[in-house]
Amino acid sequence: MIIRSPKPEVKIVVERDPVKTSFEKWAKPGHFSKTLAKGPDTTTWIWNLHADAHDFDSHTKDLEEISRKVFSAHFGQLAIIFIWLSGMYFHGARFSNYEAWLADPTHIKPSAQVVWPIVGQEILNGDVGGGFRGIQITSGFFQLWRASGITSELQLYCTAIGALIFAALMLFAGWFHYHKAAPELAWFQDVESMLNHHLAGLLGLGSLSWAGHQIHVSLPINQLLDAGVDPKEIPLPHEFILNRDLLAQLYPSFAKGLTPFFTLNWSEYSDFLTFRGGLNPVTGGLWLTDTAHHHLAIAVLFLIAGHMYKTNWRIGHNLKDILEAHKGPFTGEGHKGLYEILTTSWHAQLAINLAMLGSLTIIVAHHMYSMPPYPYLAIDYGTQLSLFTHHMWIGGFIIVGAAAHAAIFMVRDYDPTTQYNNLLDRVLRHRDAIVSHLNWVCIFLGFHSFGLYIHNDTMSALGRPQDMFSDTAIQLQPIFAQWIQNTHASAPGSTAPGATASTSLTWGGGDLVTVGSKVALLPIPLGTADFLVHHIHAFTIHVTVLILLKGVLFARSSRLIPDKANLGFRFPCDGPGRGGTCQVSAWDHVFLGLFWMYNAISVVIFHFSWKMQSDVWGSISDQGVVTHITGGNFAQSSITINGWLRDFLWAQASQVIQSYGSSLSAYGLLFLGAHFVWAFSLMFLFSGRGYWQELIESIVWAHNKLKVAPAIQPRALSIVQGRAVGVAHYLLGGIVTTWAFFLARIIAVG
């Protein structure tokens, strides 16, 4: 790989007109590879084309050129995101009942899709209330729009148009920064400038501008909506921004302007920057004054953080110095050499970022229900379930991606000669201890967690309920989790001044919030059933980590294949004539890791779905009696495998199975079709390549007989291609099956 040394002084360095814009070249399939550009001889060509189109490492060894391609591709990605967002806002403007929902969010369900009657599928347009017929949506956009202060469909139109303009700008920027003014390598490697700009600009000013919007637009509009003012009567956003008196009527401290700020009398602003905790009883969402305060505080932190790193002014941190000074008593050279890795290997950089982003996505999933950020989100059970499930799946995929890119770094970018006795080298040298210990943990967790269930199933089958692990027999209470819950529940009053409730109602205490006779949130009790399933979570997560980590640590070499690095990231076996060396590539570990990730996330979303229906979601009577959707059956039913099958999977599948002839019938078809896609994957996963090659040759013979033989020779999928197609269909089929099962159920009963 060609690497140029960075210049000491930070300058904005670009190369003018480095690559000619050529539609002729662009239109030629495989132009990035000499072999592929020749065109297809066999059907393998189309697979290789897809596999390598975005593998910029394989196009060139010049790190600068690779960096420019990645940078340009990011603008393309942003353009796609803006187009997608524009579509969402356009649907809200053109096909939705947003204004009706805004006027009565407790009785009207959100819908932003109306099916056209072509072959009778207008049956899918269910009655969502207020005389509107359409498909009920569960994306949470309506709640987000209300929190943003959007009060009309015209505003959604304008935002949709704005997003398209931004998409066009992004497409232009992607072209411009590759073809017209491409940054030099030194610019991509200038980490201090990058940190300063990303922290202060992206996160600092980004949070500050959102806080400004919340304070000047969202808060006053939501205050009036909560008070029952008709959305059409509420002043438009620009009126609040331009007319301070309007704001001062709602938040008196606005009349004082910036005087309290400069006189350090900040508590004057506590009418719109609060620290209450808990939920707004009108909307069942977080107090928007709390979230405005939060974004302002985050902005201050990141604006400070964005001034910490040394650039042209001789003050501030230097990342290389920080890393090289980081030595512990047992870590040898510590982080020495990591700076060079992270400035020359974008795979290493990406692996760390994906690991953190994936974890953060899963944290988001857990906060969306425990601290619902938007008005009326908490009583829209379909949206709650969808947001949790979506963020869990996405987080799982991103974490597997982290392992994939870590392994690619090991194979393609790692240079053992420059890494001696630093942390990475030391981890690699005791990888056998790491993997064997992790394997022991997996076996322990697997046998013990599953064993508890098997014990319960056996006792239940023998009619001995008194000998089961349950809240009413042999208790296994999650005492540590309960201790954490109690600590948080009793925290308000002794922690932040003015906090009247804990961060989340789920911690405990006597509070419950109901909106429109539906439960928004209440304290979530944890018992033996949760203790059991949490150990299944521990087991599946540890196995996923074992597979992925083994793939990374043994990506370059192993006792079985000492020269594995020479074989590349993905290979089927170590050549012919060496048995028992198949499925050992780093790619194969990612492949296997995906199945265990799927296992792990499935158990999590099943646990969440049943627990919430059993112990949280439900309705409240005029006398204050709460009736949960499944009547609190989680604690006693989920402690056996049979209970999971009978009272969760089978009992709750009745809605999707019986959906034909109703507005939910699309979910019934998806449920059926996705089962088929899942089963189809097994044909690829349990296949032998030779079997298909023989079959193909018979079929080609028949075509030759009829003189209709193709010019491009058909070939069976390679082993790796077959596994890739298999895992893709396995995951797609499994996830869509779950999606249809969850939504048909929760829309029918929620």
UniProtKB/Swiss-Prot annotation:
The residues listed in the UniProt record as binding phylloquinone, with positions renumbered to this chain, are W692
Where, subcellularly, is it found?
Plastid, Chloroplast thylakoid membrane
EC number(s) stated in the UniProt entry for this protein: 1.97.1.12
Q: Where does [4Fe-4S] cluster bind?
A: C573, C582
Cite the binding residues for chlorophyll a. M683, Y691
Q: Provide the species name.
A: Pinus koraiensis
Q: Could you state a single Gene Ontology molecular function term?
A: electron transfer activity
Name the keywords, alphabetized. Answer: 4Fe-4S, Chlorophyll, Chloroplast, Chromophore, Electron transport, Iron, Iron-sulfur, Magnesium, Membrane, Metal-binding, Oxidoreductase, Photosynthesis, Photosystem I, Plastid, Thylakoid, Transmembrane, Transmembrane helix, Transport
In its keyword annotation, does this UniProt entry include Disulfide bond?
A: no
Q: Name one GO cellular component term.
A: photosystem I
Q: How does it assemble?
A: The PsaA/B heterodimer binds the P700 chlorophyll special pair and subsequent electron acceptors. PSI consists of a core antenna complex that captures photons, and an electron transfer chain that converts photonic excitation into a charge separation. The eukaryotic PSI reaction center is composed of at least 11 subunits.
PROSITE patterns given in the database record: PHOTOSYSTEM_I_PSAAB
Presence of keyword Electron transport: yes
Which residue ranges traverse the bilayer?
A: 70-93, 156-179, 195-219, 291-309, 346-369, 385-411, 433-455, 531-549, 589-610, 664-686, 724-744
Q: Domain of life here?
A: Eukaryota
Protein topology in the membrane: Multi-pass membrane protein
Protein family per UniProt = Belongs to the PsaA/PsaB family.
State the protein's name: Photosystem I P700 chlorophyll a apoprotein A1
